[in-house]
Amino acid sequence: LKATGMEFQEDKLEDDFQKMSDVLLRSSSATFMYRDFQSRNVMIKDGEPWFIDFQGGRKGPFYYDIASFLWQAKAKYPDSLRKELLQEYMEALRKYQPIDESYFYSQLRHFVLFRTLQVLGAYGFRGYFEKKPHFIQSVPYAIENLRELLKEEYPEYPYLCNVLRELTGLKQFTDDLKKRQLTVKVMSFAY
């Protein structure tokens, strides 16, 4: 946030982040949490998925990996696919533990917001401070995810959501993403 020049009250943000922490900590941490679970870390070999880059894994809530995979900034999965994959996930999870769907979705939405903020922080640091272009290019996609998330209310975090809405409305984040797509024009060709 500070890099954008936005003004905000740090103590109010801290209060909302404490509330978020309390909500997230309601979830069990008794499962393996990949932490960087995204499509580029899943390889298909002989028709079977193989997982790479899991050295940062540890015990944690399974919601985080679901949020990481299904709300990847550049993946732009449609809601219909997310819903289908969430249903598949819950069916598989039911083999190991009972699932209260209402609670599942209630907790998941908080993890999706948390993961989106974590991604924006990482992209901002690696892009704007370490000057890595790939991360700068990824920021608008994560902002678009955040914009979509904020269409649904998070009454637990009123100040945070107001700041995030202001952030998503900044000029540098309101450009049409289609303008950012690469277009290659071949003007001559020889062989």
What are these regions (language model features)?
Residues 31, 50-52:
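Protein kinase-like catalytic core scaffold
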Residues 36, 53:
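Conserved catalytic-loop position in the HRD/HxD motif
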